[in-house]
Amino acid sequence: MKTLIDSISAEVMKAFTENGYDAKYGKVTLSNRPDLCEYQCNGAMAAAKEYKCAPFMISDKIAEGLKDNAMFESVESVKPGFINLKLSKDYLASVVTSMKEDEGRFGCDKTDDPKTIIVDYGGANVAKPLHVGHLRSAIIGESVKRIGKFMGHHVIGDVHLGDWGLQMGLIIVELKERKPELVYFDENYEGEYPKEAPFTISELEDIYPTASKKSKEDEAFREAAMEATSELQRGRRGYRALLEHILNVSVTDLKKNYDNLNVSFELWKGESDAQPYIPGMVQMMKDEGYAYMSEGALVVDVKEDTDTKEIPPCIILKSDGASLYSTTDLATIVMRMEDYSPDSIIYLADQRQSMHFIQVFRCARKTGLVDDHVKLIHIGFGTMNGKDGKPFKTRDGGVMRLEYLLDEINEEMLKKITENQKEKENLDISDEEAKKTARMVALAAIKYGDLSNQASKDYIFDIERFTSFEGNTGPYILYTIVRIKSILAKYQANGKDLPNGAILPAHSASEKNLMLVLSRFNAMMENAYEELAPHKICAYIYELANAFNGFYHENKILAQEDESIKDSYISLLMLTKGVLETCIDVLGFSAPDRM
C-alpha cells in the first residue's frame, strides 16, 4: 500500500504539472502548524525562483486546481506561497479501512527486494554474567533485527561470543589449581573426556574474576595463563574439551538471561569460530601487498585523502604474532561472507569503538574481503547513566548484573500493579497472573526507556520514571493497549461479534486525529528501517496512544446509540490495537490482557 504522504504528493505534483510547472515542486510534508492544516506544500516558494514570478501566484493556481479533488476537505493558498491541505473525512476513512483489511501488515508492504542482513549484537563473554553494560546492545540490536524482518528481509542475529584469548587461559589455570586431578590436565590421557562439565555456572562465574585478580598480582600465574591460552589455540585436546564445557555451560545460562529480555539469536558463533580463517586471510593480505611490517607489527594502511582526522593503520598481527580484535573481526567477516553472502552487516557496539570499526571496515573493503555493494554499518550507542549522570552502577559502586536489575524493576512493577488492583478493588487477579503481568510491564519499561532515546545519545536510567503509567513510558503504552482490549471484551460480552465492515468518516476532531496518526504507520515503519532507528517507532506509538486516549475521553464508545457508528468505533479500536501491538512486537515486548 502506497504511503499516504506519497499519495497526497502525487496529486499535488499532478496539479503542478497541469499548470506548467515541474512536478518536483509538488512534494508534500506533514504540517508544522497542525492548528492550521494537516499537510503542506512549500514548493511554490522554490518554483518562483525558476519561473520568475511571485510564489503566491503559483500557490493560488495549484490551490484552484485542487479545490474539487475528492482527497481534500480544503486546499488553501497562503501568502507568501504556502499551500495548506486538509484531507477529506471520506478519503481518510477509506485509507484506514484499507489498513484494517490488511490484517497483520496494516498497509505496510513487505519489500519486493529482500536482502540478507546480519546483525551482530549482544556482546556477551563466556564465563561472565551479563551486566547492565550489555543491555543497550541487546535491546537495540533485537529491535533493529525485528524491524528488518518485519519489512521482509532475511535477518540473522549473531551474538558473537567473546570466547577466545587470555580469559580462557585464566579459567584453565585457575581450574587446574582448584581441581588438579581432572583428566583434562593429563597430557598423556587418550580416552574420551566426560560429557558433563566439571563445574557449574556459579563456579565458573567465581573462577574467572578470581583468576583475573590473581593475574594482576602474580606474574607467574599470568604467564601460566598465557601459556595455557597458547596451548588451547594450538589445539591441546584437554584444553579444547574444557573450552567446549565452558561454552556449553555459559551459553545455557546466557540463553536463559537473554530469554528474560525477550532477546534471541539465530547464531551463537564466537570469536573461536573465526580463528581458522585467520591464517589464509593474513597470507592473502601479505601476498596482495596490502599488509606490511611496521614497528614489528603487521599492519594495513586505511587512511584516505578526504580524512579530516588521523586514521591509524589497522593492526593485523602484533609483534609476537598474536591476533587482535581487529584480526578476529576481519576473519569473522570472511566467515560470514562465505557462509551467508550478506548484503549488510550491522554491528551494535558502544560509540567509543567507532575508530575500531572505521579501521576494520576500511581494511575489509581495501583488501577485497567484501564486495562494493555490501554495507558495513556500526550503530554506536551512548551510555546508560544513573541519576547522577555517570555510568549506571550498584549502590556500592560496582557494575550491576543484568538479572539483578531486572529483578529490581520486576519488584517495583509488581508493587505498582498490586496497589493499582487494591485501588480499583479488582481483586480477582491471582498472585501468579500479577507476577506474570509485572514481568511483561517491567520489560516494556526497560526496553521503551532505552529505545525511546536515539541510540547514539546517553540517557538517564530512572526506574521511577520508566515504571510510571503516565507520560512517555512503556507502561503507558501497555496501559493504552489494555484499555482497548477491555473495551473490545465488553463489546463481545454483549454477545456481539467484532465488526468487519468499513470504518465510517470521522464524527469528531479527535476521531479524525486518531485516523491521521494511524494513516502514517507504513511511512513511519519504512523510515525506521531506512534509518535503523527504533526511537522513531517509540515516538510514533506515543503519539498514537495520546491520539487514542484523546478520542476515548471525548467520545462515548460502548454507550453510542447509533449501532453503525458504534461498530465503526470498534473497528477503529481494532485497527489501533493492531498497529500498537505490531509496533511493540518490533520493539521487543508485548502487552498483557489486563493490568
Which sequence ranges carry the predicted segments?
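Generic start-of-chain signal for non-secretory N-termini
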Residues: 1-21
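NTP-dependent nucleotidyl-transfer catalytic core
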Residues: 17, 21-46, 51-595
